[in-house]
Amino acid sequence: MSNEIVDKLYKVILDRIEKRPTGSYTAEIVNKGKAYVARKVGEESVETIVASLAENKERFISEVADLIYHLLVLMALEGVTPDDIYRELERRRK
């Protein structure tokens, strides 16, 4: 697996933010504002921690996916791309 799925998801998120289609969860949370999206990131972080402590791998994977999705939405609202994060991670690796 590569970064491809993250990049594809980010592009879908950008499209949903731009077009705000009815029935889109992304559009729904973005319409509530950046503070709401940031709170969702916090909630998903806690849920990820709880799933980890419960030692339930399937639940943990699901919560990590939710956290990544909400982080990508917040990143889009901040104008930060996955490439920005990849570069920062690469910089830290050195």
Swiss-Prot record:
Annotated disulfide bonds: none
One GO MF term attached to the UniProt entry: ATP binding
Main localisation: cytoplasm
Keyword S-adenosyl-L-methionine recorded: no
Gene Ontology biological process terms in this record: L-histidine biosynthetic process
Pfam families with a match to the protein in the record: PRA-PH
Substrates-to-products reaction catalysed: 1-(5-phospho-beta-D-ribosyl)-ATP + H2O = 1-(5-phospho-beta-D-ribosyl)-5'-AMP + diphosphate + H(+)
GO cellular component annotations of the record: cytoplasm
Protein localization: Cytoplasm
Its EC number(s): 3.6.1.31
Family matches, as CDD domains: NTP-PPase_HisIE_like (cd11534)
Similarity section: Belongs to the PRA-PH family.
HAMAP family named in the record: HisE
Descriptive protein name: Phosphoribosyl-ATP pyrophosphatase
Lineage: Archaea, Thermoproteota, Thermoprotei, Sulfolobales, Sulfolobaceae
